[in-house]
């Protein structure tokens, strides 16, 4: 597999040799967004409320997020991509719930959406596991996006939106958190990318 950017990072990048990651996925994301140990942030495991302190499945109201601090300091803040640090309600029929074609007014409590945790704007998904061609829980701010255009591919859509946000920058200090779904399963790749590796 041709990986020029990863190769360049390996050759010229900084190596952290006294660094560890205490957990995977959602807990690490919560730590990154708050600067706290994942249990202090409220996500000790994943985004299910286990009704135990440190395992509430969403970033705690006591945990201040980086964009909340930066917004108070005069920054414009933007989040593009996968949020996946808010409680994921369980449904009896998970397949029905995860079907993008079934519309929902909200995907978690609105107070836990990125635009209510310090980000001025958010384009992306609330949940973590999505179809790359027709993503479930795709929102603009608090509003669900009911359909995507033909040929939609979430990795490209997130990159394009991030570039648009950067181009809109003025003299206001700007912070963007870009969180791709890739390389999370279901690992959907564009046909032309797959063809390169046959």
What label would you give each PLM region?
Residues 1-198:
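Formylglycine-dependent sulfatase
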């Amino acid at each position: 597999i041709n990986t020029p950017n990863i190769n360049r990072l390996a050759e010229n990048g900084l190596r952290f040799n006294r660094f560890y990651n205490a957990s995977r996925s959602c807990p690490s994301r919560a730590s990154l967004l708050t600067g706290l140990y994942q249990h202090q942030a409220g996500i000790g495991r994943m985004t299910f409320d286990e009704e135990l302190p440190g395992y509430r499945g969403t970033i705690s109201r006591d945990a201040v997020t980086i964009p909340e601090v930066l917004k108070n300091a005069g920054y414009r803040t933007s989040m593009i991509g996968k949020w996946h640090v808010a409680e994921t309600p369980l449904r009896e029929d998970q397949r029905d719930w995860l079907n993008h074609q079934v519309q929902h007014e909200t995907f978690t409590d609105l107070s836990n959406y990125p635009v209510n945790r310090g980000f001025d704007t958010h384009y992306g998904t609330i949940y973590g596991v999505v179809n790359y061609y027709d993503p479930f829980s795709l929102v603009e701010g608090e509003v669900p996006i009911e359909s995507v255009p033909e040929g939609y591919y979430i990795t490209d859509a997130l990159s394009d939106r991030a570039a648009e946000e950067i181009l809109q920058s003025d003299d206001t200090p700007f912070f963007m958190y870009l969180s791709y779904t890739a390389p999370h399963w279901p690992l959907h790749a564009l046909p032309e990318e797959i063809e390169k590796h046959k």
